[in-house]
Amino acid sequence: MNKKLFYLCYVADKNDKMLVLDYKHFKQFATKENYQEITCHITNNINNILSRHQQFSVFVNMKGLTISEIEKHQHFIQAISVYLKDRYPNMLEKCYIMNAPFVFSQIFNIVSMFIDKTTQSKIEVIAKKDIK
């Protein structure tokens, strides 16, 4: 397995139900040509968690994300969001988003109006001031 792909998405401990997604590694690895490989890797990790747990959590580190990168990967972000929502309904326990750039927070505030209340309650954007 490609080392960058491993660090892009991994489970910290085999008994854990926390999936870690790190934008730093996504940025180095992701291209339109390997979006399918990334989706399969994320799906495999979620399936491994769900073989031991009824739900999974996600920790997303967005450090280094820029508006141009959001635009560059917009179609992938939309496609994988819909895919995961449809494939794993009601299986997300919690989603923690850390190091989100200011622009993400502004976009999320607008987009969250279109996300159902149950899903909204599962998403927590961790402010930089709250990181110890």
Which residues make up each language-model segment?
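SEC14/CRAL-TRIO lipid-binding/transfer domains and related phosphoinositide-recognition modules
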Residues: 1-90, 94, 98, 102-132
